[in-house]
């Protein structure tokens, strides 16, 4: 091993950024193929490549942090800054979709019938499945906070229980959202309303799936005794991400489901 006189982690060459970029290309191209030609081969290939990349990359990070001790305090500080900047970029990502929605709804054009929702669109009832989804996500925010406090108090059993509850609530939210999509009286091709609705709620749903995956990895780490009350940034980052997803949903519910209907 080469001696280094600093506390920073010098990463070895890794193929996972390249395979991750390849999987992103395959998935986006696969989505276009699915929308236009009803072919899912490319999309499924991209999803498989993405799943394999996530598994290998998370395995490497766990090995470097838990077994090799590369995540020193300066490295953890850098990871915190990185996660904060990542969530900030996500805020601006969703801001673009909200901008598109409000731009179209506050001054509807004659082509939309001069009012919002546009002529011919029957919006979803905000007091049915969307309200249940809101309750589910708020409950998951409580349970992940419970898990965090249990971890800091070295209460292993309660941490596992609370984290498992959070993951199950995330899966339940995803299933409810999928059922809502199937039963929706409009599609993504139904003008500006359909496109902004499905793009915004769809990307939020994707973030819930990513967050649920992130928390599942944290659960496996906790079961393998990787976390301590002082060293658990992986879980902390997942909790930040989950709270961000919660807040985005509240804005989404108030804007698109309640006000927009």
From Swiss-Prot:
CDD domains: Cyt_c_Oxidase_III. InterPro entries: Cyt_c/ubiquinol_Oxase_su3 (IPR024791), Cyt_c_oxase_su3_dom (IPR033945), Cyt_c_oxidase-like_su3 (IPR000298), Cyt_c_oxidase_su3-like_sf (IPR035973), Cyt_c_oxidase_su3_a-hlx (IPR013833). Keywords: Membrane, Mitochondrion, Mitochondrion inner membrane, Translocase, Transmembrane, Transmembrane helix. Residues 35-40, 106-128, 184-190, 257-261 are mitochondrial intermembrane. One of its GO terms (cellular component) is respiratory chain complex IV. GO terms for molecular function: cytochrome-c oxidase activity. It is a multi-pass membrane protein. GO terms for biological process: mitochondrial electron transport, cytochrome c to oxygen; respiratory chain complex IV assembly. It holds the Pfam family COX3. The keyword Disulfide bond does not apply. The chain crosses the membrane at residues 16-34, 41-66, 73-105, 129-152, 156-183, 191-223, 233-256. It is found in: Mitochondrion inner membrane. Residues 1-15, 67-72, 153-155, 224-232 are mitochondrial matrix. Gene3D superfamilies: 1.10.287.70, Cytochrome c oxidase, subunit III, four-helix bundle. Its EC number is 7.1.1.9. PROSITE patterns: COX3. It catalyses: 4 Fe(II)-[cytochrome c] + O2 + 8 H(+)(in) = 4 Fe(III)-[cytochrome c] + 2 H2O + 4 H(+)(out). It is an enzyme of class 7 (translocase). Component of the cytochrome c oxidase (complex IV, CIV), a multisubunit enzyme composed of 14 subunits. The complex is composed of a catalytic core of 3 subunits MT-CO1, MT-CO2 and MT-CO3, encoded in the mitochondrial DNA, and 11 supernumerary subunits COX4I, COX5A, COX5B, COX6A, COX6B, COX6C, COX7A, COX7B, COX7C, COX8 and NDUFA4, which are encoded in the nuclear genome. Belongs to the cytochrome c oxidase subunit 3 family. Component of the cytochrome c oxidase, the last enzyme in the mitochondrial electron transport chain which drives oxidative phosphorylation. The respiratory chain contains 3 multisubunit complexes succinate dehydrogenase (complex II, CII), ubiquinol-cytochrome c oxidoreductase (cytochrome b-c1 complex, complex III, CIII) and cytochrome c oxidase (complex IV, CIV), that cooperate to transfer electrons derived from NADH and succinate to molecular oxygen, creating an electrochemical gradient over the inner membrane that drives transmembrane transport and the ATP synthase. This is Cytochrome c oxidase subunit 3.
